């Protein structure tokens, strides 16, 4: 099972570091994939959950693409990032990623081989067999 760090967090949320490129690189360096939040504003890619915080280029994304799961925060980002592992949603119970995986938000749905975000809960009690889990606590899952 793949473990995906939520915005670069490894040992719990650190809001001021989330989506920071160096923080993301640290999570990748520790062996995790990372879910990041990306938006496109005036032709420029930005990392940041609620607002654009860190400007990045494709030259930063490209060498990390096999480790990144890009949550596209707007339609422009979805169009720009379709070559990467990416997905978009607002309040949907599930969404498909560009790699064909189901990113499942409604945990009452039982789907094997899906990606399950257990952001706030470091303890897992799952009936299904997920492809991956996205969490702020990846170190607890090793």
What kind of region is each of these model predictions?
Residues 1-142:
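Phosphate-group recognition and catalysis centered on beta-loop-alpha active-site segments
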